[in-house]
Curated annotation (Swiss-Prot):
The keyword Membrane does not apply. Pfam families: Zn_clus. It is found in: Nucleus. CDD domains: fungal_TF_MHR, GAL4. Factor for control of RNA levels of a group of leucine-specific genes. This is Regulatory protein LEU3. One of its GO terms (biological process) is negative regulation of transcription by RNA polymerase II. One of its GO terms (cellular component) is nucleus. GO terms for molecular function: DNA-binding transcription activator activity, RNA polymerase II-specific; DNA-binding transcription factor activity, RNA polymerase II-specific; DNA-binding transcription repressor activity, RNA polymerase II-specific; sequence-specific DNA binding; transcription cis-regulatory region binding; zinc ion binding. Residues 1-28, 673-709, 734-756 are annotated as: Disordered.
């Protein structure tokens, strides 16, 4: 028994010892639990921090990064996914209230697929998100949103596919051209050297121009899928390829001559597509590249060519209206309006269908924008395809168009509603609704515009799209001008419209004046926004589409007209003057060449301001002489009522021409066709002397307390002879097309295009099969055994460059854009201003044709040393088998 008890006691004590050891070991294991540091967790690598504590782990010490132990740390991609889910949940709760049950179910299915798709949170995209967050914090202090007091936030509410023309980071709230993300990769920029006619571009030149287009121009109209790359775009559509290069050359230093020559060639290609196209419904990069192929990509070329048309000096020569009409009809011809459902195009793949739908939406956007800017009825078709793409951002059956393009389509549709509502009376001469209906309709449209603005602001409205929204607001409120009676009810001084009206002659005096104050404030806010974009990025104005510059000019005319009217005392004149001066600076800096439309508009705006100021002073003097009874309204009506939302702009130009006596001037110029060049030069010198005297007089009268901004305002708005100044500007149109004399060509000769420098008609098959200049040089060296008389004949028939040897430029090695810039740099360093950098030289083109007009032949006939005379002599000698060099 004792032994048994001893055994029991021994076993109990042993069990107690084993339990205590187990507890001790458990506590030791609990204390020695391994924790990986944050960096090793993120990289999913083995960590020895528990062994080296308190020293950093081996990997952190090697990378020289802090070794942090955090118990509740989770990897970044999970946190990014959870944040995206949370943001999408908040957006759904805010937006689902306006959708039907079917749309809600469809939207939920789409969102589930997006959230549960692990490919949306790969390491590459996480790195991009990190980089974007870092760049956002860097540029936040100088972003334009901070000027408006709005926070900057990154939005992940958009789906981004590889085929989207905008990259992942392009959906940020701010438009930041300095840190633009529309950058093409090196693989996308790879392209073989290409040539069109006598224009040759190397691979580096093509890459540079495509990058220029992607970073500077693509943001205004994201219609082209640049992810295809330059080489593939060329095989799909050579026309689109060369249009992109032409647009990229607009601001390249030292490439003005190259841009001019390429513009002529591109113009001929587009005209060939318009007249005799080859239709391809499903183009492929495996097809042979042909210039005159009409497809979805040629429509994109016309859209880009419409937004950035060739440079002209007047609105009448602008090609935007013609090219957008061609683009719309061509889009219908290739079936873009029914690409999503028609059995005829069922063979097209999904990528091509998405391309077609996006292009069709852009056609309607650009067509409405051009029509609203010129005051013409728009040819648009906001059909089911366009409307469904606007309303349902993530529909499976539709293309995932960029958010920027969707917002542009919404604004364009509202502009179309304005025209259809306010100009929908066939019984009226102008199509305008009656006076009783006008005021209520304007109130309804204004409320609809406010709702649209709120909706767009919630969906990350950037600066470019807000620019278009403010333009639409100005277009809507401009209809208040048409409430005023016509000019027959006011005073007139001969052919000069004074625009004076009685208060009793106003249909709805109070509402009309209230609306005019609204349109004044809207125009001021629009110009303030445009100037803020310029201050945020001084280079953005250089890449503005031509329509944007025209919108700035039109809003400035509204401000000038209302400041110099009887509503002067009711307006914020100081802000209006500042906005007007900013508009002059904006248009001047938007100029590409001297005497283009932007350059001339800045000068015309100065004349319009001084003209209205003189008229306003004369009206005030008349009121004072009448005893101080201000019984009349002044400058509140318009004469031009056929241009819809831009009636005021064309009415201002009409008043300017009336004041300048342009009608009389045109009659005088028809009678007298010859002029003395010496007298014209003397007049120019006298005018320059008057300008210098005027500036000296203004500077001598400057008060001591006037700052530079006020001094610039005074110089801009004080013109001594506005009528004379405006007449000179209106006469100067060197960039407009030259008239083609109908009797100057024979049936067998080739016509040159207006303002052309190319004499021969383009052979499209020859262009595609044309050898490069280096190959032509080698080929010419191999053919050196040709007889002398044949060489002489070819030399005679070939146009000779002015001021150079008879060697043709095609036989010389090509110069890259960088080399041309280096050659141009010494000549232009002395003259850095716009006026001196791009002088307009009214000389003969680079190449002269054999078929000249009679006037040009007679102009140099008395000069016996001219090439014209001896060239004809050489032709006669060759005809009679005489060698002129023997």
């Amino acid at each position: 028994m004792e032994g048994r008890s001893d055994f029991v006691a021994t076993s109990q004590s042993g069990s107690e010892m084993s339990h205590s050891e187990t507890r001790n070991r458990t506590g030791m294991n609990a204390r020695k639990r391994k924790f990986a540091c944050v960096e090793c967790r993120q990289q999913k690598s083995k960590c020895d921090a528990h062994e080296r504590a308190p020293e950093p782990c081996t990997k952190c010490a090697k990378k020289n990064v802090p070794c942090i132990l955090k118990r509740d740390f989770r990897r970044t991609y999970k946190r990014a996914r959870n944040e995206a889910i949370e943001k999408r949940f908040k957006e759904l709760t805010r937006t689902l209230t306006n959708l039907t049950s079917d749309e809600i179910l469809k939207k939920i299915e789409e969102e589930q697929e997006i959230v549960l798709d692990n490919s949306n949170f790969t390491k590459e995209k996480v790195k991009q998100l990190r980089k974007s967050a870092f760049e956002t914090t860097e540029i936040e202090p100088r972003s334009y949103k901070t000027l408006r007091g709005e926070p900057i936030s990154y939005s992940t509410n958009r789906r981004h596919t590889d085929s989207s023309p905008l990259t992942l980071l392009s959906s940020s709230t701010n438009f930041d051209p300095v840190h633009s993300t529309n950058v093409m990769t090196d693989d996308q920029l790879k392209c073989l050297p290409k040539s069109l006619g006598d224009v040759y571009l190397s691979s580096s030149d093509i890459a540079e121009l495509f990058q220029e287009f992607a970073t500077k121009y693509h943001q205004f109209l994201p219609v082209v899928d640049l992810s295809k790359g330059a080489e593939r775009i060329y095989h799909l559509s050579p026309c689109l390829f060369w249009v992109i290069l032409l647009i990229g050359l607009r601001r390249k230093f030292g490439a003005t001559d190259l841009m001019t020559r390429l513009s002529v060639l591109v113009k001929s290609v587009l005209s060939e597509i318009t007249i005799s196209p080859i239709i391809r419904y499903t183009p492929s990069d495996k097809d042979e590249p042909v210039l005159n192929v009409a497809s979805v990509y040629s429509v994109q070329a016309f859209l880009l060519y419409t937004f950035w048309p060739p440079l002209t000096s007047s609105l009448s020569a602008d090609t935007s209206w013609n090219t957008i009409g061609t683009a719309m009809f061509q889009a219908l011809r290739v079936g873009l309006n029914c690409a999503g459902f028609s059995k005829e195009y069922a063979s097209a793949n999904s990528e091509l269908v998405n391309e077609q739908i996006r292009t069709w939406i852009c056609c309607n956007v650009v067509s409405q924008t051009v029509a609203s800017s010129f005051g013409f009825p728009a040819y648009v078709s906001f059909d089911y395809l366009v409307i469904s793409s606007i309303r349902v951002p993530n529909s499976k059956s539709q293309v995932d168009i960029p958010n920027e393009l969707r917002q542009m389509a919404q604004i364009a549709r509202f502009e179309n509603q304005i025209v259809n509502t306010m100009n929908s009376t066939p019984a009226s001469v102008t199509g305008m609704v009656s006076q009783e209906e006008k005021q209520p309709l304007l109130h309804v449209l204004n409320q609809q515009l406010s709702q649209l603005e709120i909706s767009l602001e919630e969906n990350n409205l950037d600066d470019i799209r807000k620019f278009l929204l403010l333009v639409a607001k100005v277009h809507l409120l401009t209809y208040y001008f048409t409430d005023v009676t016509s000019q027959s009810a006011g005073k007139s001084n001969g052919n000069i419209y004074e625009g004076s009206y009685s208060i009793m002659e106003l249909d709805t005096s109070f509402e009309t004046k209230r609306g005019l104050v609204k349109v004044y404030n809207a125009a001021v806010n629009f110009l303030i926004h445009a100037n803020s974009m310029w201050e945020h990025d001084p280079t953005i104005i250089k890449y503005f589409p031509g329509l944007f510059v025209l919108n700035i000019w039109q809003s400035a005319c509204i401000i000038s007209k209302l400041i110099h009217s009887s509503l002067h005392s009711m307006l914020d004149v100081n802000s209006g003057k500042k906005a007007y001066n900013n508009a002059i600076s904006l248009t001047f800096n938007a100029s590409v060449l001297k005497y283009d439309m932007a350059y001339r508009s800045s000068g015309i705006m100065r004349s319009i301001w001084s003209l209205f100021a003189n008229m306003y002073d004369a009206w005030k003097n008349d009121q004072k002489e009448g005893g101080g009874r201000l019984n009349n309204d002044f400058n509140l009506g318009i004469t031009i009522k056929s241009r819809m939302s831009v009636n005021v702009f064309f009415d201002c130009l009409y008043i300017l021409k009336e004041k300048c006596g342009m009608a009389k001037l045109e009659r005088e110029t028809k009678v007298s066709t010859a002029y003395n060049v010496d007298e014209e030069e003397e007049e120019d010198e006298d005018e320059e002397g008057e300008e210098e005297e005027e500036e000296e007089e203004l500077s001598s009268k400057v008060p001591e307390n006037m700052d530079s901004q006020q001094l610039r305002t005074r110089k801009f708005t004080n013109v001594r002879h506005p009528e004379k100044k405006a007449r000179k500007i209106i006469e100067t149109i060197p960039l407009d097309p030259n008239p083609i004399n109908a009797g100057s060509t024979s049936s067998g000769s080739s016509l040159t295009t207006p303002n052309s420098q190319v004499a021969n008609t383009i052979s499209y098959r020859g262009i595609l099969n044309k050898m490069s200049p280096r190959e032509q040089l080698n080929h010419a060296n191999l053919d050196s055994s040709v007889s002398t008389d044949i060489k002489d004949t070819e030399a005679v028939n070939e146009p000779l460059p002015i001021g150079r040897n008879a060697e043709h430029p095609a036989n010389q090695p090509p110069l890259s854009i960088t080399q041309m810039q280096e050659n141009t740099l010494p000549a232009t360093q002395a003259n850095s201003s716009l006026l001196e950098t791009y002088p307009i030289v009214q000389s003969n083109p680079v190449t002269t044709t054999i078929k000249e007009s009679p006037n040009s032949i007679m102009a140099g006939w008395d000069n016996w040393e001219s090439d014209m005379v001896w060239r004809d002599v050489d032709i006669l000698m060759n005809e009679f088998a005489f060698n002129p060099k023997v």
